[in-house]
């Protein structure tokens, strides 16, 4: 019996609909070569099985059957691990899975647009494709940690201690701590605190709308086990909200004067966050460790607390509190109704140990809409 792989159609008969990436062509060619070798191995196994039956050699037949079972399992693993096409967008990969509820005791929201709460197995392949595109256009210089982080993302996230486990992207070799000192981003902290009165006055103007309806235009309500948590975004996952910015023009202009505000990728946010009395935010992890989350206290009643990595801290009006939200964290307002809501202005700043070249690359890799 003669074995031969079937002939493929002539290349001239195929009209390509796109020009594929050379890296993907190389990956696909290597995959086809692997399968060609596997088919040759299958041919030899079947031939050995037939010969064993003819010779009535029970030991050889048992051995061949075991090898066939191992071969079938290996084929399943190869097929399962074959990367998906890199031409889908990051947003489609992130949004393709169903929004989650409460998992493993930690909170997930129900928004398909939320970067933290939606995942997809093809995300790392897409991120690597984005990194390759960026490096070809600019340079691989300074990309070592990002390359390492994307390449070994699964191992990093699976092996992280439960106290810190970012949901989407972990950049290796960053100094880590639940809370950061004010000097970590001194310029931006001082600028925010100097503009405390401005931000507070614009909040008070937009918060008056709550007296006329339960959820005024521009506000979002977040899922909590008790109480109510409202947010008013100026920038949501790297996307500016023009209608909201018009209502807080001076606060929005202030963002442009911050040196380390993450405004160009999906990990960057700026919003007013309101907790009503009796509210508890379920403990959860943020999406990445490349940022520092900054809370500027606007209205802080008693019995309000933030807990990050098991360490409690209290906000203070007119002062910034910096923390790494990739640590397990929660917040609550146990004050009375008479005390009113807890209000902070939240803004995401770059981790001080993320280099300028890395920031530029991460803005490209995690750009909104990619």
Swiss-Prot record:
Annotated Gene Ontology cellular component terms: membrane
The record's GO molecular-function terms, alphabetically, read: dioxygenase activity; metal ion binding
Keyword Metal-binding on entry: yes
- Membrane topology field: Single-pass type II membrane protein
Instruction: Name the major location.
Output: membrane
User: Where does the sequence pass through the membrane?
Assistant: 58-78
Identify the keywords attached in UniProt to this record, alphabetized. Answer: Dioxygenase, Glycoprotein, Iron, Membrane, Metal-binding, Oxidoreductase, Signal-anchor, Transmembrane, Transmembrane helix
- Coiled-coil-forming residues are none
Q: What is its EC number?
A: 1.14.11.-
Instruction: Return the PANTHER family for the record.
Output: ASPARTATE BETA-HYDROXYLASE DOMAIN CONTAINING 2, ASPARTATE BETA-HYDROXYLASE DOMAIN-CONTAINING PROTEIN 2
Query: What is this protein identified as?
Result: Aspartate beta-hydroxylase domain-containing protein 2
Q: What species is given as this protein's source?
A: Xenopus tropicalis (Western clawed frog)
Q: What is the lineage of its organism?
A: Eukaryota, Metazoa, Chordata, Craniata, Vertebrata
What is the primary gene name for this protein? asphd2
């Amino acid at each position: 019996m003669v074995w031969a792989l079937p002939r493929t159609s002539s290349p001239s008969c195929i009209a390509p609909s796109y020009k594929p990436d050379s890296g993907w062509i190389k990956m696909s060619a290597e995959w086809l070569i692997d399968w060609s070798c596997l088919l040759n191995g299958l041919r030899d196994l079947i031939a050995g099985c037939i010969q064993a039956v003819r010779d009535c050699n029970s030991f050889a037949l048992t051995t061949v059957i075991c090898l066939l079972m191992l071969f079938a399992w290996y084929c399943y693993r190869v097929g399962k691990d074959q990367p998906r096409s890199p031409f889908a967008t990051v947003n489609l990969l992130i949004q393709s899975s169903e929004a989650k509820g409460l998992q493993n005791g930690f909170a997930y929201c129900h928004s398909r647009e939320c970067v933290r709460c939606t995942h997809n197995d093809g995300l790392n392949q897409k991120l690597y494709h984005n990194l390759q595109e960026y490096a070809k256009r600019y340079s691989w210089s300074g990309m070592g940690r990002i390359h390492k982080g994307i390449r070994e993302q699964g191992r990093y996230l699976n092996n992280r201690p439960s106290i810190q486990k970012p949901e989407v992207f972990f950049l290796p070799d960053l100094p880590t701590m639940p809370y950061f000192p004010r000097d970590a981003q001194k310029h931006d902290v001082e600028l925010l605190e100097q503009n405390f009165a401005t931000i507070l006055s614009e909040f008070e103007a937009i918060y008056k709308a709550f007296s006329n309806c339960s959820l005024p235009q521009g506000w979002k309500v977040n899922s909590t086990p008790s109480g109510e948590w409202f947010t008013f975004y100026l920038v949501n996952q790297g996307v500016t909200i023009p209608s909201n910015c018009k209502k807080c023009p001076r606060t929005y202009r202030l963002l442009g004067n911050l040196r380390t505000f993450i405004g160009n990728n999906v990990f960057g946010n700026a919003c007013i966050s309101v907790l009503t009395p009796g509210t508890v935010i379920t403990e959860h992890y943020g999406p990445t460790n490349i940022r520092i989350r900054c809370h500027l206290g606007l209205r802080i009643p008693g019995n309000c607390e933030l807990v990050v990595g098991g360490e409690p801290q209290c906000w203070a009006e007119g002062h910034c509190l910096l923390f790494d939200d990739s640590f397990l964290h929660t917040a609550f307002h146990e004050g009375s109704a008479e005390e009113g809501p807890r209000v902070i202005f939240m803004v995401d700043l770059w981790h001080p140990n993320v280099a300028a070249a890395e920031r530029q690359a991460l803005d490209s890799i995690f750009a909104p809409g990619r």
